[in-house]
């Protein structure tokens, strides 16, 4: 018997997804493999995902795999590599605390005295709809069904039907929905899940319905006893697939509380299973209040992915009496506003207007090409692994795909994908891209990405081993099939080809020969294809850096794989905790290497990108811009922030920063340089058209201040509109800012304003301002920075003096539009 000892690396513990992947890895071997959690003193068959989940394994638990059988030596090598390198990738990422923190109630809402219930924010957003209570269905009718001779047959039929339904949904869904459906499919295909139902029927003589329910209760009891929140929240998944089995087996016993949403609805339930959520008409799902759902439940993950706000912590009995009433679920502030009056509804209408403006502005910004502050162009692209990720990447502002990991098509399957399957996958992403470039990295398999059906022997050091372009000659037919598929797809869009792990010119010359052979074959076969294709290499082996000039004669572009390049340059395994602190690309040697690559390539008219993790690190963006890189490719959620930051950077200043960094003697000196580097920011004018509004239909003072502060947030003049609003209200409490003549001048000197601003709203009708000076038709709000000195007094004084002038006031009230108001104020006032 051989043993692998390790500490569990999974932050969320051994839940469904990693348990399924570990089970799949272990199931490849004939040997018996036992998983042991030493903290729990729990053992499990490693070829059963449910058994693995039942061990209650948490992050950093001491664990081992015991392997015994004819292929134990090979199994140990493969599984040890998997545990050390890829096991952690099977975990899911928990939302950050910042996403889940309720904001204090803004004064513009609290002053309206709304009827509120307070909960915990699980998914942010605001939803308006009718409160609808969903009662849980009783399973007693299924439990009471007597045993039958046909039960075993019915179980097999129901399992097969459910698997077929899940597979059909998998074909129709993408993103988080697909991931969660895959987890459910893995659970029903687990031998222990169905095996325990069979044992309950044969050994305890239970009927099929009772056996399904008993199995559900047993598994849920194990999960509920776990110390891990994440594992406890998998109870909903077990209940979900068990209830689906019951409904398939006895369709005549329809659920009493089937959900049909015919109007905007705030759904209130003890819990909601993922399949129930997926069955809803999301157009009418305004929000959810789930009493028992935790922060990592699959239903909540789906809700976040669908932008559905969710609260918890509100007992059902506290809400039941409000069923059927209108409400607002505010998952920004963590409140439920019951039966809102006109004023409260008005607050949320203003909030929605601001949200719509923000969304429109973000979409417009994401769609813009990436430029530096001084108009230096740089491409911002996305790293993706499947065609399904492409639309989301482009929505985030990706100008192309800098790395399409084609090896994902080859993994987790029993045989390689054929040419047609690959062609369809590549064609799909090209059609989604339009004329945007898609860089297909040819299969980076072997080494640390073992593919069982290739039968490549295991290696002591897979990172330095037989992988990527090094295996292509042995598997020339496999490689040729991929080239044919990419060339066929390339006729439908802007496809480019990138070869990984190249270290010599001979390799790329061989690849070019294979491309020509593939083109000849496609012509012979009469298949539509591209006659030529742009060709590049991944620069991740240091030897390439010294012959970039030679490669420039053979390829069109270079993309630096910073992850592997860092490891190879320093001889550091970043997964080895003893040396991983040495893994740092921001050192003089690494930066000088990048500088050499870029300089040599540019001298010969070739472009250079970077597609490792470094490309999306906002802290190092000034260095990457300064080094002259032409493209940065990153995970798509990072793209909007990187584009926004890039617009604030001056390329000349960044070039000087990069020059100084290359002269540093240590990483610490470079970090100090970065800390001291303060990009010059555009000075935004005090008065601007974006902050002037006419004919605004506000009902009260609260809406006016809410809108003007919120608009400053939309326009990037503050990152903290709620805090800025609070400062305005604190000043308002000292003395009312109504100054007479139908004018109010709310003002504050605040740390929360990034660019001092004057905001103006001329109203469609007068509103009360709680002032002896009467109603207000014109609001002029001053928000000045805390470091403005006495400037706010000067501005306020100028305005006050001008407003005494009847002609000036009449001109303000008579101005036809916002531009006319701006022109008048710029003429009359000096700042």
Curated annotation (Swiss-Prot):
Protein family membership: Belongs to the PEP-utilizing enzyme family.
Localization terms from the record: Cytoplasm
A GO term, aspect molecular function: phosphoenolpyruvate-protein phosphotransferase activity
Organism encoding this protein: Escherichia coli (strain K12)
Alphabetic keyword roster: Cytoplasm, Kinase, Magnesium, Metal-binding, Phosphoprotein, Phosphotransferase system, Sugar transport, Transferase, Transport
Description of its domains: The PTS EIIA type-2 domain is phosphorylated by phospho-HPr on a histidyl residue. Then, it transfers the phosphoryl group to the PTS EIIB type-2 domain.
Cofactor(s) the record lists: Mg(2+)
Name of the molecule in the record: Multiphosphoryl transfer protein 1
Modification Phosphohistidine, positions: 15, 298, 747
Domain PTS EIIA type-2 as annotated: residue spans: 685-828
Binding site for Mg(2+): 540, 564
Annotated catalytic residues: 15 (pros-phosphohistidine intermediate), 298 (tele-phosphohistidine intermediate), 611 (proton donor), 747 (tele-phosphohistidine intermediate)
Chain segments carrying region PTS EI: 119-650
Function recorded in the entry: Multifunctional protein that includes general (non sugar-specific) and sugar-specific components of the phosphoenolpyruvate-dependent sugar phosphotransferase system (sugar PTS). This major carbohydrate active transport system catalyzes the phosphorylation of incoming sugar substrates concomitantly with their translocation across the cell membrane. The enzyme II FryABC PTS system is involved in fructose transport.
């Amino acid at each position: 018997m051989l043993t692998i000892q390790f500490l569990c690396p999974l932050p969320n513990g051994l839940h469904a997804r990693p348990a399924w992947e570990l089970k799949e890895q272990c199931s490849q071997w004939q040997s018996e493999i036992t998983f042991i959690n030493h903290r729990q003193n729990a053992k499990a068959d490693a070829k059963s995902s449910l058994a693995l989940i039942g061990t209650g394994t948490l992050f950093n638990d001491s664990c081992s795999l015991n392997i015994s059988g004819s292929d134990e030596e090979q199994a140990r090598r493969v599984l040890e590599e998997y545990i050390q390198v890829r096991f952690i990738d099977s975990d899911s990422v928990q939302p950050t605390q910042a996403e889940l923190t309720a904001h204090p109630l803004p004064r513009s809402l609290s002053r309206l005295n709304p009827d509120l219930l307070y909960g915990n924010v699980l998914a942010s957003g605001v939803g308006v709809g009718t409160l609808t209570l969903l009662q849980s269905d009783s399973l007693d009718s299924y439990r009471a069904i007597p045993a039958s001779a046909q039960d075993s047959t019915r179980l097999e039929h129901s399992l097969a039907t459910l698997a077929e339904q899940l597979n059909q949904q998998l074909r129709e869904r993408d993103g988080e929905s697909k991931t969660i459906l895959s987890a459910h499919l893995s659970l029903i295909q687990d031998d222990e899940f169905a095996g325990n139902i069979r044992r309950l029927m044969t050994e305890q003589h239970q009927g099929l319905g009772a056996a399904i329910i008993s199995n559900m209760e047993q598994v849920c009891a194990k999960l509920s006893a776990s110390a891990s929140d994440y594992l406890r929240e998998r109870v909903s998944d077990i209940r979900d697939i068990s209830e689906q089995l019951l409904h398939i087996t006895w369709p005549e016993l329809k659920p009493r509380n089937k959900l049909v949403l015919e109007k905007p609805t705030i759904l209130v339930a003890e819990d909601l299973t993922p399949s129930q959520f997926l069955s809803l008409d999301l157009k009418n799902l305004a929000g959810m209040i789930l009493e028992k759902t935790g922060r990592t439940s699959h239903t909540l993950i789906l809700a976040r992915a669908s932008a559905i706000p969710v609260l918890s912590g509100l007992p059902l009995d506290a809400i039941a009496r409000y069923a059927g009433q209108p409400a607002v679920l505010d998952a920004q502030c963590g409140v439920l506003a019951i039966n809102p009056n006109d004023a409260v509804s008005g607050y949320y209408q203003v909030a929605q207007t601001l949200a719509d403006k923000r969304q429109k502005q973000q979409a417009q910004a994401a769609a813009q090409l990436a430029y530096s502050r001084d108009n230096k162009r740089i491409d911002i692209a996305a790293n993706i692994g499947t065609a399904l990720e492409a639309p989301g990447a482009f929505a985030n502002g990706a100008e192309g795909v800098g790395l399409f990991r084609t090896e994902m098509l080859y993994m987790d399957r029993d045989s390689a994908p054929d040419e047609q399957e690959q062609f369809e996958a590549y064609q799909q992403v090209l059609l989604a891209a339009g004329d945007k470039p898609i860089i297909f990295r040819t299969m980076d398999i072997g080494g640390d990405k073992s593919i069982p059906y290739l039968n490549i022997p295991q290696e002591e050091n897979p990172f330095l081993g037989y992988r990527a372009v090094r295996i292509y000659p042995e598997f020339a037919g496999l490689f040729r099939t991929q080239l044919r598929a990419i060339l066929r797809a390339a006729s439908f869009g802007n496809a480019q080809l990138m070869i990984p792990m190249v270290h010599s010119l001979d390799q790329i010359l061989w690849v070019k020969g294979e491309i020509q052979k593939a083109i000849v074959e496609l012509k012979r076969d009469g298949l539509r294809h591209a006659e030529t294709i742009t060709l590049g290499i991944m620069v991740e082996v240091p030897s390439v850096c010294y012959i970039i000039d030679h490669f420039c004669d053979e390829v069109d572009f270079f993309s630096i794989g910073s992850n592997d390049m860092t490891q190879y340059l320093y001889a550091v395994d970043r997964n080895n905790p003893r040396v991983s602190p040495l893994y740092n690309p921001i050192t003089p040697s690494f930066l000088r290497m990048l500088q050499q690559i870029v300089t040599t390539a540019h001298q010969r008219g070739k472009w250079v990108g970077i597609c490792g993790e470094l490309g999306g690190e906002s802290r190092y963006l000034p260095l990457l811009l300064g080094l002259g890189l032409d493209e940065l490719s990153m995970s798509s959620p990072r793209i909007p922030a990187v584009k926004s930051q890039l617009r604030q950077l001056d390329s000349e200043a960044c070039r000087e920063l990069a020059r100084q960094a290359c002269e540093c003697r240590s990483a610490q000196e470079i970090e100090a340089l970065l800390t001291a580097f303060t990009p010059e920011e555009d000075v935004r004018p005090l008065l601007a058209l974006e902050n002037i509004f006419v004919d605004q239909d506000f009902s009260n003072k609260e809406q006016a201040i809410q809108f003007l502060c919120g608009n400053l947030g939309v326009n990037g003049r503050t990152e903290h509109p709620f805090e800025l609003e609070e400062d305005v209200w604190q000043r308002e409490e000292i003395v009312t800012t109504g100054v007479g003549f139908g004018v109010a001048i709310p003002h504050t000197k605040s740390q929360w304003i990034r660019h001092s601003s004057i905001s103006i709203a001329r109203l469609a009708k007068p509103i009360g301002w709680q002032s002896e000076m009467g109603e207000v038709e014109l609001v002029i709000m001053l928000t000045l920075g805390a470091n403005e000195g006495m400037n706010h007094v000067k501005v306020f004084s100028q305005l006050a003096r001008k407003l005494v002038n009847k002609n000036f006031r009449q001109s303000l009230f008579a101005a036809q539009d916002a531009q006319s108001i701006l022109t008048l104020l710029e003429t009359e006032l000096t700042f």
